[in-house]
């Protein structure tokens, strides 16, 4: 079934033939859907703490944190391509000669485009895009409304302009403050300073795409000194790539291996579940996990920190009780053995 070339490619991806056959069988049979029993509610899957309990768990974490090793684990390999899918559709399908953008939206039902245009001036990258567009098109202000919006989107996505869709979401302008704009990547450092640090040292680990390694390191070198000065923390930052051994194959409609035009097997990165491999490589007492674009502006960092500390405090409390029970079991087992032996 597999050619010598196929076998070499499979081996190069750190996979085995058995694993590929398992993938093929799974694709053919399909994935079983989970049957949901009911929605989680407070008291039934959702824990609601009283105010004094919140304080207890936060204090427990604060007291124990100096003796713990901690890291913030951030999946950050996602590219912005999917985020801008509706804008690519707009550029590909909208014809300036056929009517207004509003008429296009009505025909295409592109609701995301409506929201985008209504809030366009509030976007964190608005000024950057306008500035770049003026450089590319000197008479930008003389264009019609429709032409302006088309050129604005082109500047965002065109490879010869800002090429936002190439970059990972973590490195795009993300939050807009009065005097500056920050990326999601940068915000994670400020947030980590509140709860994922011990003895004024914070560890962060980002999983990234290999093609963006240079971009992330450049951004890190640009922001680290200022962030450390502002937070009075030292940051240890590491990166890893999603492992090739977690890639998956695809099948044609005839259930044959899908191959590129050069005859090589098409391997595609798996979802976030594949990052369990990267997570398992880390050795820390506590690992805080947060996706790259799940980060808030600075004014909410303290509130977010309290919830993270509560969760970690609950973890420590459960761990303490578990260890206590295990030690009691060990003691009683030893006691029982000594009684039956002598």
Explain the meaning of each model-derived region.
Residues 2, 7-14, 32, 36-342:
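Domain-scale recognition of functional cores that engage charged ligands
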Residues 7-27:
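Conserved catalytic alpha/beta core of Sir2/sirtuin-type deacylases, generalized to analogous enzyme cores
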């Amino acid at each position: 079934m597999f050619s010598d070339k196929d076998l070499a490619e499979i081996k190069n991806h750190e996979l085995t033939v058995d694993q590929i056959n398992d993938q093929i069988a799974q694709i053919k049979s399909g994935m079983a859907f989970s049957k949901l029993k009911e929605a989680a509610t407070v008291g039934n899957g959702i824990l609601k703490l009283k105010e004094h309990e919140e304080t207890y768990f936060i204090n427990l974490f604060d007291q124990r944190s100096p003796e713990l090793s901690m890291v913030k684990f951030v999946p950050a390999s996602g590219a912005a391509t999917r985020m801008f899918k509706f804008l690519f559709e707009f550029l590909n399908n909208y014809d300036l000669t056929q009517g207004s953008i509003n008429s296009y939206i009505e025909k295409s039902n592109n609701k995301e485009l409506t929201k985008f245009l209504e809030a366009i001036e509030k976007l964190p990258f608005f000024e950057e895009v306008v500035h770049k567009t003026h450089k590319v098109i000197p008479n930008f202000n003389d264009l019609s409304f429709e032409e302006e919006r088309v050129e604005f989107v082109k500047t965002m996505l065109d490879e010869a302009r800002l090429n936002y869709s190439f970059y990972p979401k973590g490195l795009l302008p993300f939050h807009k403050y009065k005097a500056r704009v920050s990326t999601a990547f940068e915000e994670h450092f400020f947030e980590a300073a509140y709860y994922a640090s011990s003895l004024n040292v914070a560890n962060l680990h980002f999983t990234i795409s290999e093609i963006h390694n240079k971009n992330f390191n450049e951004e890190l070198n640009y922001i680290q000194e200022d962030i450390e000065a502002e937070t009075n923390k030292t940051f240890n930052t590491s990166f890893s790539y999603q492992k090739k051994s977690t890639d998956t194959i695809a099948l044609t409609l005839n259930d044959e291996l899908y191959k590129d035009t050069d005859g090589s097997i098409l391997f595609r990165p798996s979802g976030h579940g594949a990052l369990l491999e990267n997570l398992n490589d880390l050795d820390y007492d506590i690992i805080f996990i947060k996706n790259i674009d799940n980060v808030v502006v600075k004014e909410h960092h303290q509130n977010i920190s309290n919830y993270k500390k509560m969760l970690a405090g609950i973890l420590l409390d459960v761990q303490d009780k578990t260890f206590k029970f295990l030690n009691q079991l060990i003691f009683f087992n030893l006691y029982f053995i000594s009684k039956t032996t002598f």
